[in-house]
Amino acid sequence: MKSILSAKTLFLCSLLLGGTASADFSLDFESGGVWAGKNDVKIPGDTGDLFSLTDDLKADQPAAYFRARATWHINDRHDLSVLYAPLSMDYSGTFDRPIDFRDGVLNPNVPTQARFRFDSYRLTYRYNFIKTDRLTFGLGLTGKIRDAEISVSQPGNTLSDDNTGFVPLINFQLAWKITEQFSFLAEGDALASSRGRAEDVMAAIQWQATDNLAFRLGYRLLEGGVDSDDTYNFSLFHYAVVGATIRF
């Protein structure tokens, strides 16, 4: 029995790690500008007042952003990556009405400062179902830890709400090699449920400068939110993307 189990274990490991001798790694860095398209808030979700950070206040935009990913390309079929993707956006203005928020009240016609922070930490496994010289397509699973906070300040009064939680997502990647140097790249994480949704999707044109270095320009959409008794928040952000990938 032990010999059978050992054989099965070796077989499974060989499937996953086959070709590990040619395994390599990549580092991906992305930056650019981000614009707020929507940011609706009601906290608590069942008794608070609904307000919009983008409509009632004004966003300080575009805001600069940065994210980084490290990927272990186990072989042609299997990829394992970690991503750090922080995001913060500042808003300012005045409310035209009193707002019940968190455990207090935000007054109208008073200078108001707000900050929306949404930091994301993700671990992704992806299996490449198609892997040719011209086309790569893969699907996988992402485990995301979100660390979010909404804070609103008026003279002598600061109210904030933070939320940390785990979100499972479906990951995908499509890479189509148009010419020897240029490719179309689409990738992202997304999932929807009855209580909320999350989408982080990018489309870009990538230039293969050398065998180990590629640059890209593109667009990223970050959208989602939650609707619960504790929190109602749905936001939308548009990104102008500049990125680089180093493979070694």
What are these regions (language model features)?
Residues 1-26:
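Cleavable N-terminal export/targeting peptides
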Residues 22-87, 243, 247:
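Short glycine/proline- and aromatic-enriched beta-strand/turn motifs that initiate or cap beta-hairpins
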Residues 29-31, 68-72, 123-127, 141-143, ...:
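Residues on the lipid-exposed face of transmembrane beta-strands in outer-membrane beta-barrel proteins
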Residues 37-63, 86-119, 146-165, 173-175, ...:
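Extracellular/periplasm-exposed beta-strand and loop segments of Gram-negative cell-envelope proteins
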Residues 77-80, 133-135, 180-184, 212-215:
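Repeated loop/turn-to-beta-strand initiation elements of outer-membrane beta-barrel proteins
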Residues 84, 133-146:
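Early exported N-terminus immediately downstream of N-terminal targeting peptides
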Residues 182-196, 222:
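Transmembrane beta-strand segments that form the barrel wall of outer-membrane beta-barrel proteins
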Residues 197-247:
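Predominantly the C-terminal beta-signal and adjacent terminal strand-loop region
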